[in-house]
A protein has these predicted regions:
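Short glycine-rich anion-binding loops that position phosphate/pyrophosphate groups of nucleotides
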Residues: 57-59, 129-133
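Glycine-rich, N-terminal phosphate-binding loop of Rossmann-like dinucleotide-binding domains
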Residues: 55, 128, 187
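Short capping loops/turns at secondary-structure boundaries
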Residues: 114, 137-138
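N-terminal active-site beta-alpha-beta segment that forms phosphate/nucleotide-binding
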Residues: 1-120
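Short polar/charged helix/loop
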Residues: 141
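Surface-exposed, charge/polar-rich loops and edge strands
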Residues: 1-7, 11, 18-25, 109-110, ...
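Short, charged low-complexity linear motifs
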Residues: 35, 126-131
């Protein structure tokens, strides 16, 4: 059974990667602008003063304009840094320098605060390949965010950022997979 779920996840991830790859630039730009508006709305609605997010890659729903807005508003933004042991360190982002980690993921160059720094935020924005209508999140397969969220004693609201067609009825899941409290898509905010 675990192999069957793993195969289902692999197939779905491949399909989603291909869909993202062939999305026309003008569609992506419009989606990113709408996502930024909705992330700002969510942050304002929750009165967030400190959040954890991630720097989106070119094929992901865009978070960079939102992060720039948050920094400009004086909201503390922590960004992840992947570690070889499967955990995430966190570092504050000031909108300036960034580099790339060993997995090709963008990361801030500021002081590394360690894995428990995320416990100080009041909102967490995570990437996802897909999320189902019960809030089950399927990531890209490395398990970093599942480990982080699963280890938090008092987890603040967690929202995944996805494209509209990535909110589905069900996603294949395993015991370690973590649910999110909602999603932000180009069409809006959906809470579960």
């Amino acid at each position: 059974m675990p192999d069957e779920v793993a195969n289902q996840k692999r197939a779905l991830r491949a399909e989603l990667r291909e869909r993202r790859r062939i999305t026309p630039d003008h569609h992506r730009q419009a989606a990113d602008a709408a996502i930024t508006e909705h992330l700002i709305q969510l942050t304002n609605d929750l009165r967030s003063q400190s959040l954890a997010a991630y720097l989106s890659l070119p094929d992901e729903p865009g978070t960079r304009d939102f992060i720039a807005w948050a920094c400009a508003k004086g909201i503390r933004v922590l960004l992840p840094i992947s570690r070889a042991d499967g955990l995430l360190d966190w570092a504050p982002y000031d909108g300036k320098a960034e580099s790339v980690d060993d997995f090709g993921m963008p990361r801030p160059t500021s002081e590394v605060l360690g894995p428990i720094a995320i416990n100080s935020v009041d909102l967490i924005i995570v990437p996802a390949a897909s999320v189902d209508r019960s809030g089950m999140r399927m990531g890209w397969g490395r398990g970093y965010f599942d480990k982080t969220l699963g280890s938090m004693e008092n987890c603040p609201p967690v929202y995944a950022v996805i494209f509209d067609d990535e909110l589905v009825d069900t996603v294949p899941s395993e015991r370690h997979d973590q649910r999110v409290d909602g999603v932000v898509t180009p069409s809006g905010i959906v809470a579960f």
